[in-house]
Amino acid sequence: SRDCITKPPIKKNADNHIYTNQSQKVIERLKWIKPGENAWSEDIPANLRLNVKGAKLSNIYKRLNPDKPSYTVTGSGGGGTHMYHWKENRALTNRERARLQTFPDDFLFIGGKESVRKQIGMAVPPKGIKVIFQALLNSLASNDYESIKPNIK
């Protein structure tokens, strides 16, 4: 996920590249969460733990692992579900989230920050849909094309 977000660097004035103002408590909590881990880490001090009973969603305050593919980009959810940078104590910007979804940097999302977040998270990644449509068109035209055999038994 690191290469996807950092290569090439996103321009400072890029569209949809607005940083979220994190509360001091969120910043302090993020300092205890390692890349690839989430808010349920046992290392987090008691005063920074989430006071949630029952469900423990795996993506709450989850940091990206810079050396692995991203986890699912979501379009909604409460606090702590915005996807978090592996090193910096902050949520990803919508432009960074759009890159994870394979949108080109010149693709402009219209609307407020949460509306744009939803558009990105609810979208089918452009590169993914391209593969699907190419396979569909080749199948409909009875063309041979490269494929991978299913491993379902």
Where are these regions (language model features)?
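C-terminal target-recognition/interaction regions appended to catalytic cores
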Residues: 3-153
